[in-house]
Structures are given as structure tokens and as C-alpha cells.
């Protein structure tokens, strides 16, 4: 039985924070191995205001500071280099990459795991940050979270997309990983004792040798803000449509732009996100809509409440957190099965589930909501209701249960 957990992640995304909260609440968190932690940053007041906010976002309230094992140097260099590289391109060549940060984190996690090893220890690692840790000869359970679908399946789908939409091919960065990185991904899955995934979609992409070690623990929705102002467009005004995410073709952007163009004055599209890489069709598409490159999280949630519907026609995900956020703000969602959210985006109730690459599907769903504002309001109410039932608390409970059922999973797979 797991009595101690060491968790390793360089950035502390929303799902990571919830896993930390679960292990803390369960009294089993041994340590959290990370890069930058505001709790350990001594020069915060000396930083420029914008950079200070970036560091403050790397705060982990609720986790005792002595359990946080941070090493900020490389990640600080990456953040500074990324900012300066916009105006001084030469700096990019000496700026650590995200992949290098992951590798360093993995090596540090392996060291902490070796020091604390024992039959009651589980090490909780993530894709791209587990290879060295899981290769260790020391005794501990190797728990692996795969937050997005299996890489071979993603490559298959994105290679298809490259052929279908060649003008968007430069934005398909998922095809850029080299053979060494892909081999590490494969070995991580092979060495894992148990694999946790956030959706049935992710599990469905895994080959049987990995899927039999898999357990679905769905990420939850943010807390629903009771009484938060929510506006709807009048029936004689265009439907306000929102997209938020990285701006590349993996998110199905070309299909969204085409469907909105077909609908003309019936809809108004707002796009929030940073381009993966600019290409001509993306520039043209953004020129025809309202584009916001980035927003603080609280402002994004407020923006959601000012729109009527959220569209996320992604080709490949794990479990799209932005969809869960949209539901929590009362937005019906139009998305694909590959978003990993079909348990909460219920077709005809809280939104529409359409096939990938379906311009017709997006168009028909938007047109129905534009013409039937009562249906829109009903779906909004249902979205809030379902979001409140699919909380992060339920995720934390399920995660702790999965950790304690590890021995059962192992016996099945032997």
C-alpha cells in the first residue's frame, strides 16, 4: 500500500496542483520535486512587476515549503531567455528548452526517489519526465500520468492532417519530436507499474500492453462561481463565439474559421491564444476575428461569461481543461470526441460532440444556437449543473483511491 508519494513536475499545471492537493489531504505527500517555487524565491521584490507575477504563479499554497524541492536556475534562464528572445533573437540559441528542463527535473526526481526508496513509496511522474527515474534500480512503485493520447496515434493523425492541410503544416509541432525523445516516451510507458490517464479517449489510444495498466481518473471542473454575472446576446444580435487555446492546426482552427465564415453575420468569433507558429492561413483567419494573444486566468474566465458558446474542434488532446473551465462558466461547448470531455459535453444537453474536421458539424451547431436562444440558455444551465457535479474534489478522491488500488492493478497485469 502507498504510504508515501514523491511527485515530480517542472511547472505545476492545474492538474498537477490538484494531484498535490490530493496527496497532501491524504497525508501521503513525501515531497514535490519541481523547478521554480515562489515559496523558495528570496528576491521576489527585486523583480520587474511582470516577471514577479510569473514567479508568483509558481506558488503552491497548501503544500508545506519544506516538502517542496525546488531548483530554479534553469527554468529562470528559460523564462528570461524566452522574453528577451523576442527582441534579441540570438539569445534563443543559449536559452534552455522545455525538453531540457524536463530532463533535468527527471534526473533530480530520480535522485530523490533513490534516497527515499522503499516498498511503501510511490513515485508519481509525468510523460517526458520519468525515463531516468523509472530506470532506477531502487525499490518504489512507478506511477505514470499520461495527460495526452499515445504519441504514435497522435503522429498518425497529424500526418494525415499535414496532407489534408499543407498550408498549416508548420503549426503541427507534435511531429517535430526526434527519435530519442520518442524512444524515451515508449520506455517510460513500458517501465511504468501503473498508468493514470484523464479520459477514456487517452486510454483508447494506447496499445493493449499499456492499456491493461491504465486507470481513468478524469480531471475536474473548476468551482462554479455562484452568482457570477453571465450575459447572453439578444436574439437579434450575433451569437458570441469563443475559442481559447494554442493557435495551431492540432486544435482544428482551419475548420472553425471556415464554419464561421460560412455563417457570416450570424456569429462573432473571439480567439484567445498565442500562435504555435504563424502561417498565412492563420494570419488571414485572425485578421477576420477579434484576437487576444493572452489573458490572466481570472480575466479569461470573466471573458467566457461574456460569450454565448465555446468552440474547441480539437484533433487530439488528453482532457481539455479549457473545456472544463468553459462549462464552469456556463458556456455550452462544441467539441470533438478527441477532446477527452464527452462525459461532460453531452450532445444536445451541455453542448455538441461533432466529428473531427467537421466544418458542417460546427456550422450546424452554431446555427441552431443562433436561432434558438432558449435552447442556448437551457444548455448554459445544464453546463453549470454538470460542472458542479464534476469537481476537482471528485478528481482528488478518485486519484487517492487509484493510488491505494495499485496492488490490485499490478496483480491483474501479472
Regions found by a protein language model. Name each.
Residues 78-97, 140-183:
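Acceptor-binding helix/loop patch of EC 2.4 sugar-transfer enzymes
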Residues 189, 294, 302-307:
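Short alpha-helical donor nucleotide-sugar binding micro-motif in glycosyltransferases
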Residues 221, 229-251, 257-262, 270:
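Conserved donor-binding/catalytic core segment of Leloir-type glycosyltransferases
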Residues 279-301:
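Nucleotide-activated donor-binding/catalytic signature segment of Leloir-type glycosyltransferases, i.e.
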Residues 315:
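Aromatic "clamp/platform" in nucleotide-sugar-dependent glycosyltransferases that forms part
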Residues 332-335:
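Short hydrophobic beta-strand element within catalytic cores of glycosyltransferases
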Residues 347-348, 352-359, 368-373:
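Conserved acidic donor-binding segment of nucleotide-sugar-dependent glycosyltransferases
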Residues 361, 368, 375-389, 401:
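A short, well-ordered alpha-helix in the C-terminal region of glycosyltransferases
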Amino acid at each position: 500500500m502507498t504510504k508515501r508519494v514523491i511527485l515530480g513536475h517542472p511547472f505545476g499545471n492545474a492538474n498537477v496542483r490538484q494531484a498535490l492537493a490530493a496527496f497532501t489531504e491524504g497525508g501521503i505527500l513525501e515531497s514535490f520535486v519541481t523547478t521554480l517555487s515562489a515559496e523558495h524565491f528570496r528576491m521576489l521584490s527585486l523583480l520587474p512587476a511582470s516577471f514577479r507575477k510569473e514567479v508568483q504563479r509558481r506558488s503552491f499554497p497548501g503544500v508545506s515549503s519544506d516538502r517542496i524541492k525546488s531548483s530554479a536556475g534553469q527554468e529562470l534562464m528559460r523564462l528570461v531567455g524566452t522574453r528577451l528572445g523576442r527582441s534579441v533573437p540570438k539569445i534563443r540559441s543559449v536559452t534552455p528548452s522545455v525538453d531540457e528542463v524536463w530532463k533535468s527535473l527527471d534526473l533530480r526526481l530520480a535522485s530523490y526517489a533513490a534516497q527515499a526508496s522503499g516498498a511503501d513509496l510511490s513515485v508519481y511522474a509525468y510523460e517526458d519526465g520519468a525515463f531516468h527515474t523509472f530506470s532506477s534500480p531502487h525499490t518504489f512503485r512507478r506511477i505514470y500520468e499520461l495527460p495526452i493520447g499515445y504519441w504514435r496515434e497522435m503522429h498518425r493523425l497529424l500526418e494525415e492532417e499535414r496532407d489534408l492541410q499543407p498550408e498549416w503544416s508548420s503549426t503541427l509541432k507534435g511531429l517535430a519530436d526526434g527519435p530519442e525523445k520518442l524512444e524515451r516516451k515508449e520506455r517510460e510507458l513500458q517501465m511504468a507499474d501503473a498508468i493514470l490517464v484523464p479520459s477514456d479517449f487517452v486510454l483508447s489510444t494506447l496499445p493493449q500492453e499499456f492499456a491493461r495498466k491504465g486507470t481513468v481518473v478524469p480531471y475536474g471542473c473548476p468551482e462554479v462561481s455562484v452568482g457570477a454575472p453571465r450575459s447572453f446576446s439578444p436574439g437579434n444580435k450575433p451569437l458570441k463565439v469563443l475559442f481559447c487555446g494554442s493557435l495551431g492546426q492540432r486544435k482544428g482552427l482551419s475548420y472553425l474559421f471556415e464554419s464561421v465564415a460560412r455563417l457570416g453575420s450570424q456569429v462573432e468569433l473571439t480567439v484567445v491564444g498565442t500562435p504555435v507558429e504563424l502561417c498565412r492561413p492563420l494570419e488571414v483567419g485572425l485578421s477576420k476575428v477579434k484576437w487576444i494573444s493572452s489573458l490572466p486566468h481570472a480575466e479569461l474566465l470573466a471573458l467566457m461569461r461574456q460569450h454565448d458558446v465555446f468552440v474547441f474542434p480539437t484533433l487530439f488532446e488528453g482532457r481539455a481543461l479549457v473545456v472544463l473551465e468553459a462549462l464552469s462558466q456556463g458556456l455550452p461547448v462544441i467539441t470533438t470526441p478527441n477532446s477527452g470531455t464527452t462525459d461532460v459535453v453531452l450532445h444536445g444537453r451541455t453542448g455538441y460532440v461533432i466529428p473531427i474536421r467537421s466544418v458542417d458539424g460546427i456550422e450546424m451547431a452554431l446555427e441552431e444556437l443562433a436561432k434558438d436562444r432558449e435552447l442556448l440558455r437551457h444548455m448554459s444551465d445544464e453546463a453549470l449543473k454538470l460542472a458542479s457535479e464534476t469537481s476537482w474534489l471528485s478528481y482528488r478522491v478518485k486519484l487517492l483511491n487509484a493510488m491505494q488500488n495499485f496492488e490490485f492493478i499490478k496483480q491483474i497485469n501479472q
